[in-house]
Amino acid sequence: MRFFIDTANVEEIKKANRMGFISGVTTNPSLVAKEGRDFNEVIQEITSIVDGPISGEVVSLEADEMIAEGRVIAKIHPNMVVKIPMTGEGLAAVKVLTEEGIKTNVTLVFSATQALLAARAGATYVSPFLGRLDDIGDDGLVLIRDIADIFEIHGIPTEIISASVRHPIHVIECAKAGADIATVPFKVFEQMLKHPLTDSGIDKFLADWEAAKK
């Protein structure tokens, strides 16, 4: 399973990229708005940091407008992926953009039926949301497993991006469930890096080294 980072914060992207474990970035209008910067400026800077898929989301709801917006996003950089909401209009836009060779990421997926429709419309990626399903008492990991099974049975090339990842356990369970990618907030990556036994082990090594020098 590969890792994308889910943020529009350039400093977080730089830190994660420096550690060598991310291969792409996902953004959305909320994340970009949080940074208080121009969308194009943020995306251009991100593409200069990470050499991999960068998802930029449309804000229109009608297919024709999404298509026009998607074409603009795709022209920013060859690595751009157009993120489109899971609606009928969204899938109509996915079909056209796919035919034009533009990669798409269908977002806000909450059922296996939605994922299957998005895949058949030509989506490069589908993004099922784990945390938001958990919030309403559903099981997001069952959804990931169901989508992965369906795609494998039918030889569907669309990749699964696990989104709305809230904690390290989500990440491990997504990997076990068959997700191709997990898009993870920087704070969750920080949690994944740490373990108390690692810290105590380092402290002991350093203490032993200092004692040996005396």
UniProtKB/Swiss-Prot annotation:
Biological classification of the source: Bacteria, Bacillati, Bacillota, Bacilli, Bacillales
Give the primary localization class: cytoplasm
Gene Ontology MF: a single term: transaldolase activity
Protein name from the UniProt record? Probable transaldolase 1
Q: What class of enzyme is it?
A: transferase
- UniProt keyword annotations, A-Z: Cytoplasm, Pentose shunt, Schiff base, Transferase
Organism name: Listeria monocytogenes serovar 1/2a (strain ATCC BAA-679 / EGD-e)
Catalytic reaction(s) noted:
D-sedoheptulose 7-phosphate + D-glyceraldehyde 3-phosphate = D-erythrose 4-phosphate + beta-D-fructose 6-phosphate
- What InterPro entries does the record point to? Aldolase_TIM, TAL/FSA, Transaldolase_3B, Transaldolase_3B/F6P_aldolase, Transaldolase_AS, TSA/FSA_arc/bac
| EC number from the UniProt entry | 2.2.1.2
The yes or no answer to whether the keyword Zinc is present is no
Its pathway, per UniProt, is: Carbohydrate degradation; pentose phosphate pathway; D-glyceraldehyde 3-phosphate and beta-D-fructose 6-phosphate from D-ribose 5-phosphate and D-xylulose 5-phosphate (non-oxidative stage): step 2/3
Give the record's GO CC terms: cytoplasm
Q: Where in the cell is it found?
A: Cytoplasm
Which gene carries the instructions for this protein?
tal1
Similarity comment text for this entry: Belongs to the transaldolase family. Type 3B subfamily.
Domain of life per record = Bacteria
Q: Where is the active site?
A: K83
On whether Transport is a keyword of this UniProt record, the answer is: no
Q: What is this protein's function?
A: Transaldolase is important for the balance of metabolites in the pentose-phosphate pathway.
GO biological processes: carbohydrate metabolic process; pentose-phosphate shunt
